[in-house]
């Protein structure tokens, strides 16, 4: 039986300030918004009318609708244990990235080594449209804050944006070699970091652009802070910069002994944006105050386990931080390392609380909203759920025949969507016992 999830909306949020572009002047100004919902037509006209308010519509989930019979591009079963509900199999090479539409969590976009990106439906794996035109591996993909736009970026620096409802391309740009890409949390504004050290910011689909020039080395990771006014960017030389998106200048710069001693690999912020966590190939995670720009804590695993299955060609002595994040309900942070260590740190005491070992390197971790459960995916192709309070493994999900390269978690934590070197993306239905 097949059914489709109906769209819905987030709860009311107070009016927010506006980020604006002014042509070639590279000036961003903050404008107070009048109460009431914005006119969508205004967003597509003047740059000063960019709206940061979240859409206010009702959202309704769908708890059924899984299709068990194979369709074109959907694998219903495979040899060995497979806990997944749906497998998307239209990619012909490794699938590098996945993102879910934030408004309804009913659509996914995936990008791969086959130079292709697809937008498809989670409930049955049905292809909605292909994001065509890339000429290199698609390593970044994501939906805008209101799920109306989807962006894809390839390694060569070609970025494209499509209107989801019309399935039409509305914008494209060729930057330098792409390192990361992220939508602004409240506006149709796209940010990206490139190998030349620049961080780019575009109004979509107008295309008005602003650049933030970093050191003469790749901008390896970045994240817009929750207030939408600042962004933190990490660089290959170990430098961390917190940028003011209004002024176009760095508020804080951490470098030398203040920064990392190796390239930045990942960055995360807590819910209110007061704290930033950065990870590096130097095996350290640094806790930084977003207000003062000072390092307030440094985390490193107490013991470094032997590194089983870190991958062919990897240097065994390297134990980089691969992923990290903050718990939303407790003062905890999780750090995942290449050697397979998941470290849970207590932020209030800045001590290691639990150390959970995987059999192979961790690729990514995500916290479940509203709980102390952290999800990990690793090079052994398994998704694991951990209770950060006890360090206990709750359950795992299997089905891939190669390493997992990325994963996404639905807002209600009912679905996990993974991508893998086995050329497939999978949807897992998560059982949620009382936490």
Curated annotation (Swiss-Prot):
Give one Pfam family: WD40
Query: Which residue ranges contain the repeat WD?
Result: 90-130, 133-172, 174-213, 215-255, 259-300, 316-355, 357-396, 399-434
Q: Give the intrachain disulfide bonds.
A: none
- CDD domains for this protein: WD40
Q: Which GO terms describe its cellular component?
A: cell surface; cytosol; intercellular bridge; microtubule cytoskeleton; plasma membrane
Which domain of life, per UniProt? Eukaryota
What role is this protein assigned?
A: Plays a role in angiogenesis and cell migration. In smooth muscle cell migration, may act through the RhoA pathway.
- Under which name does UniProt file this protein? Angio-associated migratory cell protein
């Amino acid at each position: 039986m097949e059914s489709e999830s109906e769209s819905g909306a987030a709860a009311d949020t107070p009016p927010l300030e506006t980020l604006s572009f002014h042509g070639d002047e590279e000036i961003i100004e903050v404008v107070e918004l009048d109460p009431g919902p914005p006119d969508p037509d205004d967003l597509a006209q003047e740059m000063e009318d960019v709206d940061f308010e979240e859409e206010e519509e009702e959202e309704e989930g769908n708890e059924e609708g899984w299709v068990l019979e194979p369709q074109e591009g959907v694998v219903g079963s495979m040899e060995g244990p497979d806990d997944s509900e749906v497998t998307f199999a239209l990619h012909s090479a490794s699938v590098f990235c996945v993102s879910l539409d934030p408004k309804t969590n009913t659509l996914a976009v995936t990008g791969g080594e086959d130079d292709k990106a697809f937008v498809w439906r989670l409930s049955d794996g049905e292809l909605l449209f292909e994001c065509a035109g890339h000429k290199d591996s698609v390593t970044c993909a994501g939906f805008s804050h209101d799920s109306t736009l989807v962006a894809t970026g390839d390694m060569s620096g070609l970025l494209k944006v499509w209107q989801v409802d019309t399935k039409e391309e509305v914008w494209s740009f060729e930057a330098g070699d792409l390192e990361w890409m992220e939508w602004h949390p409240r506006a149709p504004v796209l940010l990206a970091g490139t190998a030349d050290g620049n961080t780019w910011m575009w109004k979509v689909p107008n295309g008005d652009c602003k650049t933030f020039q970093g050191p003469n080395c790749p901008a390896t990771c970045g994240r817009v802070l929750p207030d939408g006014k600042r962004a933190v960017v990490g660089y290959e030389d170990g430098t961390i910069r917190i940028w003011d998106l209004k002024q176009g200048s760095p508020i804080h710069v951490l470098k030398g002994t203040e920064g990392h001693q190796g390239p930045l690999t990942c960055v995360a912020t807590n819910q209110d944006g007061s704290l930033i966590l950065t990870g590096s190939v130097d095996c350290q995670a640094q806790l930084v105050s977003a207000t003062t720009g000072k390092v307030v804590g440094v985390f490193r695993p107490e013991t470094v386990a032997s590194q089983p299955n870190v991958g062919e060609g990897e240097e065994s002595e390297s134990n980089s931080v691969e992923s990290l994040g903050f718990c939303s309900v407790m003062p905890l942070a999780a750090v995942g390392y290449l050697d397979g260590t998941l470290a849970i740190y207590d932020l209030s005491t800045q001590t290691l609380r639990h150390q959970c070992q995987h059999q192979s390197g961790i690729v990514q971790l995500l916290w479940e909203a509203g709980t102390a459960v952290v999800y990990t995916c690793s090079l052994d192709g398994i998704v694991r759920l951990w209770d950060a309070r006890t360090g206990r493994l709750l359950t795992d999900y299997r089905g891939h025949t190669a390493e997992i390269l990325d994963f996404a978690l639905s807002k209600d934590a009912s679905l996990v969507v993974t991508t893998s070197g086995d050329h497939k993306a999978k949807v897992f239905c998560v059982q949620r016992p009382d936490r």
